[in-house]
Amino acid sequence: MLRNEKQKLRVLFCHSIRLHYLCNMINYDLKKIKAIVFDVDGVLSMQTVAMDAEGQPLRTVNIKDGYAIQLAQKLGLKIAIITGGHSDSIRKRYEYLGVEDVYMKAAVKTETYAELKKKYSLSDDEIMYMGDDIPDYQLMRLCGCPCCPKDACSDIK
């Protein structure tokens, strides 16, 4: 792994996220992280959703997030998506980026999270989760390193 690439990844993530208060960063070793799990709406896509002529939601994604995800994978991190929503275009986007674990319509995110941990034999301390709203709260309490976008709802910050 190239040192320069690790620095780029750190800058990309630290620029756009706020580490959650549940994660005591003073004593936390980010080197433990083996997987990063993301929510979609409000995290990897904008908080506003346009609708097409058939009433299907149209979401926009940030190209820099895609670059950061690919770089994280290149550095050996497992990337997963756990979202309560469903969008074929979002699924295709992250599959295109090489994300193998894209869980849509996750009614209870903590159950999907437990499946993911079991699949890869991960502990909570080895997982970073980024969420932005109340449905993410319980999962953020479980993972080793919860974080959120700067514009997350105040209850999550």
State where each predicted segment sits:
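Non-catalytic pre-domain segments flanking phosphatase-related domains
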Residues: 2-4, 9, 13-38
